[in-house]
Design a protein with these regions (language model features):
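Tubulin/FtsZ superfamily GTPase core signature
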Residues: 1-268
């Protein structure tokens, strides 16, 4: 069973949106943790909270947004599960909506987590940008914006987690380089130039394409395989190590997820 950990308001709301079949752990100030007035207190005063992260599974996904004060407890909590394979999902907030203090917290957390990823303390760090996600949402209002953003994050991770553990009918799962731990995800329809990228990752060095092909295209689209191979060849010319897998589905449209990798630190 896949373990999902949500820290803070955003992390908890995202984890709670996942379907059944996951082990969900939510941690927030004022409930599982004390509520402190400063981020420094979360770093200094947290002790004896190992019971919150008591699970036998070896891999987990840890969802957190760095703009909240409670995010300062992340490093303490991650120390409790440092022997696990930790995939951190960082929710990058829209900075125009943040106070000066929140901006500082976000930038510090963003940089620290990237250093953790590069050092190997994290198995991976997926970056999700609220601003980028809003740019491709079909509609949202002030009241339900975050609800739609969270749904978009959940949808992509439920699919990616599922397909990474399934055997494809064509191709082989990507084996990224040891250093390629900073990541994001892209979504789009096959044959369509429009790309929905969850974060504008700079200096992409590797890409894994997960292609979900409907029955009609699987049987009758004689150009599709050339299209998929052509994308890999184009990436090779750009020095981007890439691979693809194909899964059959009963969806109306054929689409893909692309996991993009890099070892370069990101700035926002």
């Amino acid at each position: 069973m896949t373990v999902l950990i949500g820290l803070g308001k955003a992390g908890c709301e995202i984890v709670n949106k996942f379907s059944d079949g996951y082990k969900k752990i939510t941690i927030d100030a004022g409930s599982e943790l004390p509520e402190f007035s400063s981020p420094e207190e979360y770093e200094q005063k947290l002790t004896n909270y190992s019971h919150l992260l008591d699970f036998d599974e070896q891999e987990c996904y840890f969802f957190v947004c760095g703009a909240g004060k409670v995010s300062a407890s992340s490093l303490r909590l991650l120390e409790l599960i440092q022997t696990k394979k930790i995939n951190l999902v960082y929710i990058y907030p829209e900075e125009i909506m943040l106070s000066p203090t929140q901006k500082k917290l976000n930038r510090v957390a963003f940089n620290v987590f990237q250093q953790y990823a590069r050092s190997g303390l994290l198995n991976s760090m997926y970056i999700m940008s609220n601003e980028e996600i809003c740019s491709f949402l079909p509609y949202y209002s002030i009241e339900d914006m975050y609800d739609h953003i969270n749904e978009a994050i959940v949808n992509v991770f439920e699919s990616v987690i599922f397909y990474l553990n399934e055997k494809p009918i064509l191709g082989s799962h990507h084996e990224p380089k040891e250093i390629s731990r900073i990541r994001t995800v892209e979504y789009g329809q096959l044959g369509d130039d429009k790309k929905n990228c969850y974060f504008p990752l700079d200096n992409v060095t590797e890409t894994c394409y997960i292609n979900i092909v409907n029955d009609e295209d699987m049987k009758n689209n004689r150009e599709l395989l050339d299209l998929l191979k052509g994308i890999i060849k184009d990436n090779t010319e750009k020095n981007i190590l890439s691979s693809f897998v194909v899964f059959k589905s009963d969806h109306q449209y054929s689409f893909y997820y692309a996991i993009r990798f890099t070892h370069y630190l990101q700035e926002k």
